[in-house]
Design a protein with these regions (language model features):
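Asparagine-centered polar/low-complexity signal
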Residues: 107-108, 114, 195, 225, ...
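Generic recognition of short, well-ordered alpha-helical segments
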Residues: 28, 75, 96-99, 110, ...
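Short, solvent-exposed loop/helix junctions and linker helices
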Residues: 19, 67, 106-109, 158, ...
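Short, charged helix-to-loop "capping" segments that act as catalytic/coupling loops
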Residues: 48, 79-82, 120-126, 197-204, ...
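N-terminal Rossmann-like NAD(P)+-binding domain of SDR-like oxidoreductases, especially those catalyzing
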Residues: 1-193, 344, 361
């Protein structure tokens, strides 16, 4: 199998359905797809602040709905007749999953079942990518990266629900899309992405949004676990990979499979190191602004629920298969985050900043 020569030009005129399109990654994906000339239908809960700022709603077909509602979801599929489906709708926060495990499992497991059922019942779909997480693996606190053939068994309700989502995808692929046994021809893949950072993430209990909120309030940044290690990557990195994978398997089903999507080892850093980088980048950006508070942080443990201490992905497979490598390291990612945040705080042109960063990335 030769390496796939991917270009965003592939998406011109393609019908793409994105679940979770109003969220952080979903909004960036829609902006990217719109720029490529795709016909995008989105299905998600009420819009996030970023989605409203990004000015994509009038450029796509945006449907507000819940992936737990199979009937409504199927109606959207029937009307859109998508060729490609990217499933990103989820309850994505570990701590929220401890507070509401039932909702987390309903959304992340049965939501995946419902989306795959719609794919099964929609003949136009040729390519499906389920976006999960690096946390699907049984975490043994190993110092090396997890590979795609490692055991799936997330610890907390969020991580475990995503492990289940992987199993659901595998079952549907084997049961309904196995062409050797008379199944319908549709390429099915999963993408297991590391921790994503970028401008416009307003979620609670995520470190970069916590940093930005602290700066907005003129406060010191609180870091609850500075020693945990995560595979941090700029938001456009995994989005590019999802779209590359969806395009490749659309044209050649042999590309379908399970793929880790993460940074190089040098960008697998502790939370404390990431916040150090944020503070350095923030202070450099506002060096000549006497009114700007200097960024600094302190460690304050809140004795919260269990979260993994060390987590890293082995991304050899996607690199070998597609010849892909991360475009930006986290220092460049942080520069873009500060640029986006400065534009936001000053009431600037957010769509222009997003398009600028997408253009530079591509």
């Amino acid at each position: 199998m030769s390496k796939y020569d991917f270009s965003m030009d592939f998406y011109k005129g393609k019908k793409v359905l994105v679940t979770g399109h109003t969220g952080f990654k979903g909004t960036w994906m829609c902006r990217m797809l719109v720029g490529a000339g795709a016909e995008v239908t989105g299905y998600a809960l009420e819009p996030s602040e970023l989605f409203k700022l990004a000015d994509v709603e009038n450029k796509i077909t945006s449907v507000i709905g819940d992936v737990r509602d199979l009937k409504h979801l199927q109606e959207v599929f029937d009307k859109a007749e998508p060729e490609i489906v990217i499933h990103m709708a989820a309850q994505p926060i570990v701590r929220d999953s401890y507070k509401n495990p039932v909702y987390t499992y309903e959304t992340n497991v049965m939501g995946t079942v419902n989306v795959l059922e719609c794919v099964r019942n929609t003949a136009s779909v040729k390519s499906f990518v389920n976006v999960t997480t690096d946390k699907v693996y049984l975490n043994r606190e190993w110092p090396w990266g997890y590979r795609e053939n490692e055991e799936l068994n997330g610890y907390d309700p969020y991580s475990n629900s995503k492990s289940c989502s992987e199993l659901v995808t595998s079952s549907y692929k084997n049961s309904f899309f196995n062409t050797k046994e008379g199944g319908r021809s549709c390429a099915i893949s999963t993408a297991r992405a590391g921790n994503v950072i970028g401008g416009g993430d307003f979620a609670n209990d995520r470190i970069i949004p916590d940093c930005v909120r602290a700066m907005q309030g003129g406060d010191e940044i609180i870091v609850r676990n500075p020693y945990s290690t995560r595979p941090y990557q700029f938001v456009l990195e995994p989005i590019y990979c999802y779209l590359m994978l969806a395009a490749a398997q659309y044209e050649d089903m042999s590309y379908a499979g399970n793929y880790n999507v993460g940074p190089d080892d040098v960008d697998c850093v502790t939370t404390g190191q990431l916040v150090d980088l944020f503070c350095t980048s923030w202070n450099a950006f506002y060096e000549k602004d006497d009114s700007a508070k200097k960024a600094s942080w302190k460690n304050v443990s809140d004795r919260g629920p269990h979260e993994a201490g060390f987590l890293k992905l082995d991304c050899s497979k996607i690199k070998a298969t597609f010849g892909w490598n991360p475009h930006w390291h986290i220092d460049k990612a942080m520069e873009n985050i500060i640029e986006w945040t400065d534009c936001y705080l000053k009431g600037g042109d957010i769509p222009a900043v997003m398009d600028k960063q997408i253009k530079e990335f591509l």
